[in-house]
C-alpha cells in the first residue's frame, strides 16, 4: 500500500495557527484542537483513497477439466499454478480458486458453478467442453451449458474468459469443426473474450504430450499459460 501525503493538511494547520496567534489562548486552543481533528480525518480519507487506488484485488475462479487440474503432473506445475506465479511477478494483488476436476463436463460445471459464485470472484475462466466432445455428446447441449455458465457468472458481476478447445480429427471433420467454432460463436454472442485454443502451439508436437496423447506434459504448461494470459491480462485490475 502506498500512502500519498500532499502536505495540504500540515500547511493548512500551520496557517491557521499563525492566524490565531493574536487570539486569546483559550479560544486559540479550541480552534487548533478542532483543526487537528479535521486534519486527522483528512489523512484517514486519503489513506482509504490511496489503498483503493493502488491495491485493487483480482479474485479468479478457474472452472475446468483435467487440462487445468494438473492431471499426471507434479503439484504446482500446471498452468493455473504458473498463473499465480505470473500474477505475483506482475505485482498484481490476486487470488485463484482452481475448481477444475479431471473428467469434468460442461453439465457438471454448470451444476457446480452457483456454489462457486458465492465466493464472488472478479473473473471466471471457463475451460470446459472437451470431455463432452470426447464422449460424443450433442453439441447443442454443450453450447447450452456453456452459455448458462457465462450468463450466471455475468449476473454475479464477474468478468468471463472463455477457453476454447479442439478435439482429434478422428471424430469426424464436421463434428470437430462445429465443436471448435461453437466457442467463437458463444464468445461473440455473449460478448466475452476468448482464448481460441488452449493447446495452440502444443497440439502438433507429440513430444509435449503424456503417454495417453491427450494430456500435456509439464513442459507444455508455460505455453498454455501464455495462451490464457493473452485473453486474461486485459481483464485484470492493476
Report the location of each language-model feature.
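N-terminal secretory signal peptides that target proteins for export/translocation
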Residues: 1-33
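Alpha-helical cap/lid subdomain in secreted, periplasmic
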Residues: 5, 82-85, 92, 108-238
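Bacterial N-terminal signal peptides
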Residues: 28, 38-49
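Short glycine-rich loop/turn motifs that provide flexible caps or phosphate-binding loops at active sites
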Residues: 42-45, 63, 71, 75, ...
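Serine-esterase "nucleophile elbow" of acetyl-processing enzymes
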Residues: 54-102, 112-120
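Acidic-and-aromatic substrate-binding clefts and catalytic sites of carbohydrate-active enzymes
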Residues: 103-107
